[in-house]
Amino acid sequence: MKKWGVLGVLLLMLVILLPYKANASVLTKKGGVNYYNGQKETYYNLNMSRIYARADANFGSHHKKWIREDGVKMYGPYVVLAVNFRKYPYGTTDIPTSLGLGIALDTGAFATETNLDQVDVAVDW
């Protein structure tokens, strides 16, 4: 049996995964709503100073607060999300979204009343 080697395995993974990434939709301002990984994605644009202050106080760290070139608001390496805290407790990281891995820092009425699987992505649009 032929050995694949690291390069062969990486090439195989690329061939298998590329069609999924290429066909995956991404949340946009124009689209307004996106469905990704079994969850509904929407976006919101609010002042994040209180959200960031609470996160810094709770985590004892001061992650970089920044806005990506595509307008997505970030906390360190994570996309800032409003979610259902019963599904994703406050501070949960690595929540998959079409715009990258997120962190649960906010919530809203939508998360308890209309769609428990919805994530609201913080943006500057």
What are these regions (language model features)?
Residues 1-22:
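Sec-dependent N-terminal signal peptides of Gram-positive bacterial secreted proteins and lipoproteins
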Residues 20-125:
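Solvent-exposed, well-ordered loop and adjacent helix/strand elements within mature globular domains
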